Design a protein with these regions (language model features):
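Short secondary-structure capping/turn micro-motifs that flank functional sites
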Residues: 38-39, 95-96, 194
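Residue-level detector of alpha-helical recognition elements and their boundaries
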Residues: 33, 37, 74, 139-140, ...
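Terminal amphipathic alpha-helical/low-complexity segments used for targeting or macromolecular assembly
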Residues: 1-91, 207-226
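Glycine-rich hexapeptide-repeat left-handed beta-helix
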Residues: 145-226
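A generic local structural motif
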Residues: 45-48, 73-74, 94, 130, ...
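Extended, small-residue-rich solenoid/repeat segments and analogous flexible loops
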Residues: 50-131, 136, 141
Length: 226
């Protein structure tokens, strides 16, 4: 019988983190790594996947950090179109409640705690030391920075970036495409596209996504006040 094969595609810190977690979490699987820069995603054919047994192969799109949420989405979409089985990687030191739901192509790093009935949608990266309380929800292709927390019943939308040390209070809603890079407690809900940085004294730089192509992030268009 063939051994299971795990292929990790990507580059940068997320790529390195995914490889380390895969070695700890799946020591009996054959691990193959393929470096792929975000700028190469639109043109890559990934022909090497044709040589793999689909029944025994899982893949993980390990491209990340903040604005690269969209590049990770593009790579995931190409893998889905090829009919590949897509893995999630969870560090053995993380605690995931049995009632929690983790989507495909999620990376859960060391020391993470995910509470009862919490939901983490596809493509999301959760860095080390993050805590998600009961019934918390994280949308697709988001990035949750280290030592951040999301309170009970709080909802974080898709394509959101929470920087390190950001704490979302219970019951708060963070709209899609928000970026919060200022550490601290956020007890009020934020509209879609809100950007919060230490450079500003109040929420600023509101953007709205006009179009997102699953085939290429080059078709990503932003509208709003810079």
């Amino acid at each position: 019988m063939s051994e299971s094969l795990l292929i990790i595609l990507g580059d940068g810190p997320t790529f390195a983190s995914a490889i380390a977690i895969a070695k700890r979490a799946h020591p009996t699987s054959v691990l193959r790594t393929e470096r792929l820069m975000p700028s190469d995603i639109a043109n890559t054919t990934m022909d090497f996947l044709d040589e793999c047994d689909p029944a025994m192969t899982s893949v993980f799109a390990a491209i990340g950090m903040h604005a690269l949420n969209y590049a990770r989405f593009d790579l995931w979409a190409k893998l889905r179109l090829r009919g590949m089985r897509i893995a999630s990687l969870i560090d053995p030191s993380a605690h995931v409640d049995p009632t929690a739901s983790i989507g495909e192509n999620c990376l859960i790093e060391s020391g993470v705690s995910i509470g009862p009935n919490a939901t983490v949608a596809a493509g999301t990266i959760i860095q080390s030391g993050v805590g998600l309380s009961a019934d918390a929800k994280i949308g697709k292709f988001s990035w949750i920075g280290m030592n951040s927390t999301v309170g009970a019943g709080a909802a974080v939308g898709s394509h959101v970036v929470l920087g390190a040390g950001v704490h979302i209070a219970s019951g708060v809603t963070i709209g899609a495409h928000c970026e919060i890079v200022q550490p601290g407690l956020f007890a009020k809900s934020l509209n879609e596209g809100t950007f919060i940085s230490p450079q500003f004294t109040e929420p600023a730089r509101v953007y709205r996504v006009a179009a997102v192509s699953p085939a290429s992030s080059s078709n990503l268009m932003w509208q709003g006040t810079p």
